[in-house]
Structures are given as structure tokens and as C-alpha cells.
Amino acid sequence: MAVAAMAERGRLSHAAPAPSTEGLPRAFLQSLRTLFDILDDRQRGYVHLREIESRWQGADARELPCGVLEGLRQVAPANGYLTFERFVAGLRTSLLKADGGQRDQARVAARPGDQSSLQQRLMFAPADEPRTVLERKPLPLSACPASGGPSGTSRNPELLCVPVEAASCPTETERPLSKALEQIPSADLGAAACKTLGKGTGEARQAPRARGERRRHTITNGVDCSLLKQMKELDQEQEVLLQGLEMMARGRDWYQQQLQRVQERQRRLSQSRAAADFGAEGSPRPLGRLLPKVQEVARCLGELLTAACSGRALPSSSLGPLGPPSPSTPVWQQQTILMLKEQNRLLTQEVTDKSERITQLEQEKSALIKQLFEARALSQQDSGPLDSTFI
């Protein structure tokens, strides 16, 4: 049966002459080709009329002009399969019928001296509005001129939207098919011109977008750049604080080692044989070379703590009278800093005194050793002649 249906479709297609698409704009044909490809989802090259009726009927297609389906039924063969050429011919027939019917109604309703028939003239919808098929909109009441002549046209910019053939030849019953379809892009441009001129007359109308211009979208839920910047700054601060904490721990260990060394030296000097022990062990590296750096570190640390205390007090005062500030914390910190400075000064002075004392003891030791050797040499010289005389 399928073979018979295919043979029937081939016989009918050869019997009836295929409609032509000559005289139609290329852009219009491309748009219709896209629509036909959507309907022909199986890529067979033809679409059955029942499929089009099932898609273009119902609640979703209530705005579809009624003449479109009748035009497709007229050009459809007996088997109901529509090729692209027949599909274009059906749409062409529906457009011509709709245009001719509107002109007939306008000609019957027209009276001498009455310009109300211009209200019934239709224009094509702008190209930027979404649509599946061609639709037409009636002109507003403001489009009717107050008086005949060129002055009325110049005072009413809406008359620019009226097709040239309809304005010049109201008694014409039927226009050529190619001219009727070629008016589609010109009508779109005329609608755009009417909207642009409408802004000058006080009508709030939005200018249409140009052909090919895409609609712009704004990202509202994207990544916040300021939040990323703040997170990066916080990470840097955390890294710096961790490095400072590590250096403070190492510095604390070094300070404790130096204190233990100083206390050990004090203990040795307090004993009776401190000089001899020190001379036996050797002189360690003196702290006097590092004293300027130690003092500089203590000064920088004190300035840092002072600036940090003042920096924490500023936001609380700028927020307003939320509560009385606690003066005990800054005073306690200042006292701690002063105490550390005093201890550092005392330790430095003590180390300096001890170093001078050690130097003095070493000099005395050297002098005593020299005197001892001199005394031994003199004693040996004095005892030599006495021994020879006795023998």
C-alpha cells in the first residue's frame, strides 16, 4: 500500500504543473523554507495537509488568520501532500485573498468626502516582532487626515505606513502578485519610520531593533567582583599574620636562649674560678653586635602594637554612642610595652657591664701570666751560679 501511495503521489505530481516561486523576494523564500523544514521534521521533502492542520489549529494557534488553511487546501493535491512550492503557493493565495477582501470592504464603506476608509487599510507588522506567519494591523484613528491634499499627509506621519498602491489607486481590485509580496520589506521599513516619527509627535513608542541585531541580556546572578577582591585581600592578610606569628615564636625562643646564656654567665662570674673557667671554654660571640638590631625590633614591635590599638578604637568611636569605651585595655597594653622596653634596657646594660668585666678580667689574667713567667725566668738565673759554686 505504501508503494501504491508513492506511485499515486508521483502520478499526481507529474500530472499537475508545479507552482513556481518566481518573483518572490529571496529573504521571504528563505523564511518560508525554514518554516517548511520545521514542519517537515522527517526530511521527506513534503508535508501532509493534516499535519499542518493539527499543528496550526487549537489554543496555541488562535491568532492564525483563517484564510491560511483554506489557501493550503486549495493548492493541495488529492493525496494531501504539500511540497515546498505548493506550500508557498497556498500562502500566496491566502495573502491575496485577505488583501483583496479588505480593499473591497474599504471601497464599499467609502463615501464622497469621507476619509474613514483609510482607517481600514492595513500594514504589515514590524520585522522585529516575533510571528510565525504574516499578520496585519489596522492603522490607528490618528492616521486619518483632517483634509485632503498633501498638507494632510505632511501633518500625519502615520500615512507613511499606507502602501503606495492602496493610496494612489483605491479603485484597483487586484494588484500583481509579485508587487504585493515585494511590499513586505517596504512595509516593515515604513512601520519603523512611523514609529520614529511618532516620538516627535509625543507618542511613547519604542524604536524597532535593526535586522540581525540580537537582544542583549544582563547577567544578574553572576560572580560579584567586589566579593572576590575582598576574599583575596583577607587571604593575603591571613598569610601575613601567620608569617608574623611564626617569626614571633622563633623570636621568643631566641630571646629565651639569650636570657639563659646571660644568666649562666652571671652565675659563672659569681663563682671564685669564673675567670679560669671562662678562659678554658673560650669567649662566645658577644651580643653587643646584635644590640642595635634587637633594639630596632623592639621599637618596631612597640609601634605596631600602638598603631593596632589605635586602629581598633577608631571604628567603635565612629559607630556612635553604643557604650562607654574601656580604657583599661589600651593602658594595660601601654604598660606592657613600657615594661618590656625597660627589661630590654636593663638586660642590655647588664650584658654590657658583664662584657666589660670579662674584658678586664682577661687583661688581668694576661698580666698575671706574664708576671709569672718573668718571675720563673729570674729565679732560674739566680739559682745557676749558686749551684756551680757549691759543687
Swiss-Prot record:
Source organism: Mus musculus
UniProt keyword annotations, A-Z: Cell cycle, Cell division, Cell junction, Cell membrane, Coiled coil, Cytoplasm, Membrane, Mitosis, Nucleus, Phosphoprotein, Tight junction
Disulfide bond annotation, renumbered to this chain: none
List of residues that carry Phosphoserine: 283
InterPro entries recorded: Suppressor_APCD_1/2 (IPR026828)
Phosphothreonine: residues bearing it: 218
Cellular component GO terms held in the UniProt record: apical cortex; apical junction complex; apical plasma membrane; bicellular tight junction; cytosol; nucleolus; nucleoplasm
Keyword Nucleus: yes
Purpose: Plays a role in planar mitotic spindle orientation in retinal progenitor cells (RPCs) and promotes the production of symmetric terminal divisions. Negatively regulates the mitotic apical cortex localization of GPSM2. Involved also in positive regulation of cell proliferation and tumor cell growth.
Predominant location category: cytoplasm
Chain intervals for the UniProt region annotation (Disordered): 1-20
Regions annotated as coiled coil: 226-277, 340-381
Organ and tissue specificity: Expressed in the retina. Expressed in retinal progenitor cells and newly differentiated neurons but not in mature retinal cells (at protein level).
Compartment(s) of residence: Cytoplasm; Nucleus; Cytoplasm, Cell cortex; Apical cell membrane
Pfam family, one: Suppressor_APC
BP term (GO), one: negative regulation of protein localization to cell cortex
Subunit structure as annotated in this protein's UniProt entry: Interacts with a spindle orientation complex at least composed of GNAI1, GPSM2 and NUMA1. Interacts with GPSM2 (via TPR motifs); this interaction is required to prevent GPSM2 anchoring at the mitotic apical cortex and is inhibited in presence of NUMA1 in a dose dependent manner. Interacts with PARD3.
Range of residues in the leader sequence: none
Protein name (record): Suppressor APC domain-containing protein 2
